[in-house]
Amino acid sequence: MQAYLNLCRDILNYGKKKIDRTKTGTRSIFGYQMRFNLEKGFPLLTTKKMNFKAIIHELLWFIKGDTNIRYLVQNNVNIWNEWPYQKYCNSNFFQNLTLQEFIDKIIIDEKFAKIHGDLGPIYGHQWRNFQGIDQLTDLISEIKKNPHSRRLILTAWDPTVIKDMLLPPCHVMIQCYVEKNKISMQLYQRSGDVFLGIPFNIASYSLLLIIIAQCTGLKPFEFIHTIGDAHIYNNHIEQIQKQIKRIPKKLPIMTLNPHIIDINQFTFNDFNLEKYESYGILKGVVAV
């Protein structure tokens, strides 16, 4: 994961100071690319401990086409909580619930969750129902039928419904590329929180590549991560500085249940991460 640490150093050394939408302030660079060879290990960050359980659950949530946080919080995944809670606080339904009380009610009250837990037509909706099109199914089908196509694309960016999303897609589009029996994937990400988001995204889309490879009978090769605005929030600089002083550990190994070849059939127990060693947890506040 030296590529990630190089990104961190480049932003600290060359990043421009910017005032962002959240008013937190960032150091930012524009147009950056990292490459990860999955044959050399699974690119899960080792310079801080990653919550891989959350990565799996969120990816399954996307694949299912779900956009409501109820599934996530029922599985103790809390990375999306702030956005529906913020909307709830600004609504006429607000009853002075704390964030934790709000989440507890999402878990136990299905009707409440249906009203207040939805994030709008974000990733899962766009992947599985982009103006009526199941892009994920079409992508896998096209890889099987026409592997050398230059149109092996999936996008989460639909300008007609951006205003209906609580957070417009940051990781916008993927493109797959097949060479012989190997498949690679490039992600274009318009905006990347380098401390909290980018490590998560690297692992998530690398895992998606492994899944798609298994569903198409190919071998996962390279994940290429292209970022538009790559930024470190001012309140994350100390954590980043700690990480770049650490020597990365050997990458873990990721395996799937070999009997699953239908992307709709994967469950949490079909994923197996082996030999993951990391430094300790580094916490940071998400900018909403």
UniProtKB/Swiss-Prot annotation:
Role description: Catalyzes the reductive methylation of 2'-deoxyuridine-5'-monophosphate (dUMP) to 2'-deoxythymidine-5'-monophosphate (dTMP) while utilizing 5,10-methylenetetrahydrofolate (mTHF) as the methyl donor and reductant in the reaction, yielding dihydrofolate (DHF) as a by-product. This enzymatic reaction provides an intracellular de novo source of dTMP, an essential precursor for DNA biosynthesis.
Source superkingdom: Bacteria
Alphabetical list of HAMAP family matching this protein: Thymidy_synth_bact (MF_00008)
Keyword Membrane part of the UniProt annotation: no
Pathway, per record: Pyrimidine metabolism; dTTP biosynthesis
Gene Ontology biological-process annotations: dTMP biosynthetic process; dTTP biosynthetic process; methylation
Cellular component, GO annotation: cytosol
Catalytic residues, chain numbering: C170
Lineage: Bacteria, Bacillati, Mycoplasmatota, Mollicutes, Acholeplasmatales
MF terms in GO: thymidylate synthase activity
Database matches in InterPro entries: Thymidate_synth/dCMP_Mease, Thymidate_synth/dCMP_Mease_dom, Thymidate_synth/dCMP_Mease_sf, Thymidylate_synthase
Protein's recorded name: Thymidylate synthase
CDD domains in UniProt: TS_Pyrimidine_HMase
Subcellular location: Cytoplasm
Keywords per UniProt: Cytoplasm, Methyltransferase, Nucleotide biosynthesis, Transferase
Reactions accelerated catalytically: dUMP + (6R)-5,10-methylene-5,6,7,8-tetrahydrofolate = 7,8-dihydrofolate + dTMP
Family of the protein in this entry: Belongs to the thymidylate synthase family. Bacterial-type ThyA subfamily.
UniProt-annotated binding residues for dUMP: R21, R150, R151, R190, S191, G192, D193, N201, H231, I232, Y233
Record's subunit section: Homodimer.
Record bears the keyword Methyltransferase: yes
Annotated binding of (6R)-5,10-methylene-5,6,7,8-tetrahydrofolate, by residue: N51, D193, A287
